Each structure stands twice: as structure tokens, then as C-alpha cells.
Amino acid sequence: MQNSLLNTHVTTIDGEVTTLEKYAGKVLLIVNVASRCGLTPQYEQLENIQKAWADQGFVVLGFPCNQFMGQEPGSEEEIKTYCASTWGVTFPMFSKIDVNGDARHPLYQKLIAAAPTAVAPEKSGFYERMVSKGRTPLYPDDILWNFEKFLVGRDGQVVQRFSPDMTPEDPIVMET
């Protein structure tokens, strides 16, 4: 059970079926991403922390998702090209997945089971704004929006879940 997250089958953005076992012993920040979202500039911060902490075994893993207002409509090739050319993304990207609902990817089933609620910036109001726009999660533990983050420790266990508006460079994320 200890490394069940790492044993989960995933598909890279280039179509290779693999597991996350090659990241064993590393700290992971797993993020559902989208290219046409107001939070898309977080790609830059994700890349910054990836570069800053890579030599200490830190890796960002991006999982595109089109479940939130269709904000990731492109093909894997389009996503890969956009992320590299617009944001300089070099961290590992994976094939588009569902993070909520009946087709929720097994990785996200495990992540959510380990961390059913997200830490949010104090008084951010992000959740309330989403609710006011009719974007209430179907279930309390659902991913709220693009760029929700899961920090996974070197032992393969989820350490914390962060809300979409908790930026990757937020001191709370960095101190965790």
C-alpha cells in the first residue's frame, strides 16, 4: 500500500504507458492543468519551482484535464507544444485525464482518498466565487478547478492537497 500511488498506470503526453515508479524517492507536486484557464500562468511558477528544486529531488507532474469549462480542448501534441513554447515547460506532462466523476483516473482516485480536502489561502474566497458562478463540486472531495495540487512525499504518500488558487510559490506550499 505504501507506494500504491507510484504503481498507478499513467500515460505520458507522448503516449507511453508507464507508472510513477521512476519518481520513487522524490517529492512530487501533481497538478491538473489547463491551457485556457485564468490560472494558466501558474505554469510559469510550476516550471520555476521545478528548476529551483530539481537537484533536491523535486518533480512537478502535469495532468491536463478538460472537465472545467472545456479549458483544455487541445490534443496532447497541441498541449505539449503550447506549454513548451508559451511557458517553457520542461517538467513531465501526461495524457489528458478526468479528475472527477465516473471516469476519474485511478491516480486521482488515490490522491483524493488520501487528501479529501484542499488547503486554501486564508480568506481567498475562491470556493465562494466558484459556487456563486454555479460551479459547485458534485461531491465534497471533488477537484474544484484546474491547478489543484497534491504534494507527495519521498515515501509516495500524499502530504497535502492545495486549492487551485494556492500558487505553487506560496510560502505554505514551499514550507510543506
Explain the meaning of each model-derived region.
Residues K26-L28, S35-R36, T40-P64, C83-W87:
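Conserved helix-turn-beta segment immediately C-terminal to the redox Cys motif
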Residues Y23, A34-L46, F63-P73, K149, ...:
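Short, thiol/selenol-centered motifs that function as redox-active sites or metal-ligating centers
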Residues P168-T176:
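A short, polar/charged loop-to-alpha-helix boundary motif
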Residues M1-E21, L39-P41, A118:
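N-terminal "domain-start" segment that seeds a small globular fold
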Residues N32, A54-E76, V89-G101:
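Thiol-based oxidoreductase modules, predominantly thioredoxin-like and allied folds used
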Residues Y82-T167:
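Thiol/selenol-based redox catalytic cores and closely related redox-interacting motifs
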